[in-house]
Amino acid sequence: MDHFGMWGIIPPVLTIALAFITKDVIVSLFLGILSGCIIVAGGNPAAALMRLTDLLAGSLADGWNIRIFLFCGLLGALVGMLSKTGAAQAFGLWMSKKLKNKTASQFATFIFGLIVFIDDYFNSLTVGTVMRPINDQHKVPRAKLAYILDSTAAPVCILAPVSSWVVTVMSIVRNSEGFGKLGMSDFEFFIRAIPYNLYALTTILMILVIIFFKSDFGAMKKSEDLARTSGLLWNEEVYGVISGDIPEEQTTRAKPLDMLLPILLLIVFAIAFFPAVSWINAIDGTTITNISQAAASMSIRDAFINTDSSYALFYAIIFTLAVTYLYYLARRLMNLKEASEAVRDGIKSMVPALIILTMAWSIGAVIRSSPTDGGLGLGRYLSELVVSSSFPLWILPAIVFALSAVIAFATGTSWGTFGIMIPIIMPIAVGLTENAGLAQNTAFNAVFICISAVLGGAVFGDHASPISDTTILSSTGAACPHLEHVATQMPYALFVASCSLAGFITGGIFMNILSAWLAVLVVFTSGMILLPKITVAKAGSEYGCLNTP
């Protein structure tokens, strides 16, 4: 048995429903995991509890997971030191004088997010740490900051030629049946497919329009109105106090450089360790015995794309913490006792996010894994529904986009969706183009748009899902209540997904990138004109009802 069929849908649906009903993400995730374990165990409560324990322990026993877990905790320690010394406050005050208004601070956050493209976790937490005080100064809602962070994480990483995401996609593409018939390298395939990644590119366009034209709608408009009228950066009545917010010290000793230096160190160390990890892994003790030989054995591009980002980020935060610790002591911004308190408070502030992250990994495992590995095999079940259906080539991109979005949203992982969908869709797309007798360029367009539909759907699901680790870390980086981030981002993500779906339908019909983008821009322009007006009209109607005698 490869899957549990429709039963696999229960855990993600239950988790998402409970999260919005109870406003308690941790309890909702726990009950979602438990429901999956009960299904896997055939209703046996003792076996379900044992499976639950194995899942939670397995999430932290995984080497990649534990390094990301430690990176997040130690980044919290760094943030604690930045706050304790007053460096974050000093930098925020300095930047607030340079960035005169909300538009400037949001655009600076957007640009910073584009620059830090090497890893989505690194992006969300680092950019959030730096830009949060500046956006707070200009009363930018935390939900808006979280949206910008989330939208410049996965959507940007999937477009960057050198990132932890690209190596994953290229490795799956390279090993997929039918790819060899295209006669191109995996990297060439990735580069040529970028224009077809409608969701990621439209998300970037959406951010710019929201920032410069202030075309907010839905729940985000309410967050903006709350910040403008009351100065509150999140709805404390609904979501309470944020436990991850670290109070900043009021001090005149810290300078803007005291904030910039640790962040620059983190970026430099991360960039340095990305290829270094590949070189270290290449040392086999026989043909390659040292770093110099390892570096000479591969190009810098190969070193970047074949690295293990979890090692690179973990080493980067360790070295950054050590240098920053000594630097602050030398600057007399804190003593040994204060440094210890800062590290402790910083790690403590990350505990809620770390618990949620562990739960998200666990529910992803029970949903994604096959029954032989103690999971439900939901992705396999959904993909089989498509494979068993009979449909023409033109509708394939739209179906693939929708299915990838559902899988990624339900499982909270885009990478898992890549692994499930690309090996299935590649041979289907190549086979259908061969059967249709398409010319080479048209056949290439068909394959590009089908695989880009997988990438776009997976990124949407990861972008919008409340159980996605990148969504969780964007909330953490912005110090925004997680459910407020989900509620405010969802309408934007769904709108961009609708634009992309229109593009994939049109692109599938004409097998042409220009027709796809024409459809995207028509739907996007119409929506950005109408949706803000609908939100204002709805708010006015509700206000009128409330004040009717």
What are these regions (language model features)?
Residues 1-4, 41-42, 97-98, 386-392, ...:
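Short, amphipathic, aromatic/basic-enriched membrane-interface segments that mark the entry/exit
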Residues 45-146, 333-441:
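Membrane-embedded alpha-helical segments and adjacent helix-loop junctions characteristic
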Residues 33-34, 110-116, 130, 147-158, ...:
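Transmembrane helix-bundle signature of multi-pass membrane transporters/permeases
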Residues 72-93, 201-218, 321-335:
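Transmembrane alpha-helical segments in integral membrane proteins
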Residues 1-71, 198-200, 211-212, 228-362, ...:
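Hydrophobic transmembrane alpha-helices of multi-pass small-molecule transporters
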Residues 11-17, 109-113, 146, 203, ...:
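Hydrophobic, membrane-inserted alpha-helices
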Residues 125-134, 458-473:
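Short helical (or helix-break) motifs at transmembrane helix termini and adjacent helical loops
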Residues 134-232, 246-258, 471-528:
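Membrane-core helix-loop-helix motifs of multi-pass transport proteins
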